Amino acid sequence: MMLDWNAYPVELSARVKEMSRLAPNAVAGFIALDKGANKTVHLDAKTRELIAIAIAVTTRCDGCIGVHTDRAINAGATREEVAEALGVAIALNAGAALAYSARVLDAYAAIDGAAKAPAE
């Protein structure tokens, strides 16, 4: 089901406010981290937001997708630039799956080898 991306930020904001009441230090820490990360010196706002969108996709964060897509649009990112950033995210996720596949083969060899090793 597709989200209503115009209504979702309002709903999310209500949950964040609730979380802020329940765990104020955690939310304050997040806000400080977010503000610090947004004060880039070498990256312009558009580039930073395109990176954030790609990361939002790889971490499967709907709230991040909504916030950073809005920020990217406001920073002047085109639909084509967003699509290219998403292409990078897709490739990275595929690459991560390939790299972690090697870990499974390692684990299989270790576990299977241990099961077949003669008892001492």
Description of each model-found segment:
Residues 1-47, 100-120:
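Acidic, glycine/proline-rich low-complexity segments that act as flexible tails and inter-domain linkers
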Residues 34-35, 52, 69-73, 87:
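Amphipathic alpha-helical segments within well-ordered protein domains
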Residues 42-59, 80-86:
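Immediate flanking context of iron-sulfur cluster ligation sites
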Residues 61-64:
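Short cysteine clusters
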Residues 67-82, 105-108:
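Iron-sulfur (Fe-S) cluster-binding segments and ferredoxin-like electron-carrier domains
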Residues 76-86, 112-120:
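Charge-rich, acidic-biased intrinsically disordered regions
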Residues 83-109:
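C-terminal structural segments of small proteins and small subunits
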